[in-house]
Amino acid sequence: MNKSYKKWDVVLVNLDPTKGSEIAKTRPCLIVSPNALNAALHNLIIIPFTSTNKAYPTRLTTNYKNKPGALAFDQIKTIDKSRVINKDGELDKNLRDAANITLQIMFSEK
């Protein structure tokens, strides 16, 4: 585990095995954990991308690598770094701002 991961990196992650309604398969995921935690821990906090863009308030529409889809904030999870297959890119600045707003809305007390 010598790889370093940063907030806003997009990584390809094997999310299997899963249970119930957890999002499955190997798919791109956005790292949202702070860099200090990414460096210190064996875990990452990620948000999976999905090609199914449902009209949920917890979905952020994307066009990552020219593939329409969404970030599934309702599926945010902590994973062990051993689930990461490779780094796939970074989220662009406009989507970072939108992702921060969505995270704030999800975890605010209002």
Where are these regions (language model features)?
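Conserved functional hotspots at enzyme active or ligand-binding sites that engage polyanionic ligands
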Residues: 1-110
